């Protein structure tokens, strides 16, 4: 039995100083538990890029709603500090000190998918090669259980964006998200 629950009318549109670019694994467009969609609906200066869709593969309603644009270097601006949010071997912990060191506005690029899919996106997406990777500091386990996770500190895309915003733009902005 599938419960029908839509949160769309509860989302308050918000424009951040930080630009959010979500690079979504194509299989995520088939999942109703995808929290990146909520983030995109709420955050006015966000973009979603679908990655890995095979040519000729039918588009899901979610993919059609968000767009079918592929991520490329053209999505990156030299006028902004482009950061990939994912805990990789090369990522540094996002902190107030790091944020203050940037002279340009920030674009936060967030891989979206299962943990396995999301880990592959920065490695396989040529446009993300050479960008600085950041990770969230240790925090409490997720407040949400949209899916079964293998580790209590794995969090959904929406929650990761919110926690990053607490550091980038302050706790008030994170609470609004």
Task: Describe the predicted segments one by one.
Residues 41-119, 123:
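S-adenosyl-L-methionine/SAH cofactor-binding core of RNA-modifying enzymes
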Residues 19-26, 81-86:
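Short hydrophobic beta-strand segments
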Residues 33-41:
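Histidine-anchored nucleotide/phosphate-binding helix
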Residues 26-28, 53-54, 89-90, 136-141:
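Short, acidic/turn-prone active-site loops that include or flank metal/cofactor-
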Residues 32-33, 58-61, 141-147:
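Short, charged, surface-exposed secondary-structure boundary motifs
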Residues 1-19:
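Cys/His-rich short segments
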Residues 107, 115-177:
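C-terminal folded domains that constitute the principal catalytic or ligand-binding module
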């Amino acid at each position: 039995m599938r419960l029908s629950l839509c949160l769309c009318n509860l989302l308050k549109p918000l424009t951040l100083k930080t630009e959010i670019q979500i690079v979504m694994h194509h299989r995520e467009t088939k999942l109703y538990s995808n929290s990146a969609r909520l983030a995109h609906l709420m955050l006015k200066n966000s973009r979603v890029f679908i990655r890995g869709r095979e040519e000729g593969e039918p588009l899901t309603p979610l993919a059609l709603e968000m767009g079918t644009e592929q991520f490329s270097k053209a999505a990156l601006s030299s006028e902004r500090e482009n950061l990939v949010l994912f805990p990789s071997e090369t990522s540094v912990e996002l902190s107030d000190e790091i944020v203050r060191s940037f002279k340009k506005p920030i674009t936060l690029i967030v891989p979206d998918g299962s943990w396995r899919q999301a880990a592959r996106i920065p490695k396989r997406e040529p446009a993300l090669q050479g960008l600085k990777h950041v990770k969230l500091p240790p925090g409490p386990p997720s407040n949400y259980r949209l899916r079964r996770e293998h580790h209590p500190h794995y969090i959904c895309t929406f929650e990761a964006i919110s926690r990053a915003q607490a550091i980038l733009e302050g706790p008030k902005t994170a609470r609004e998200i």
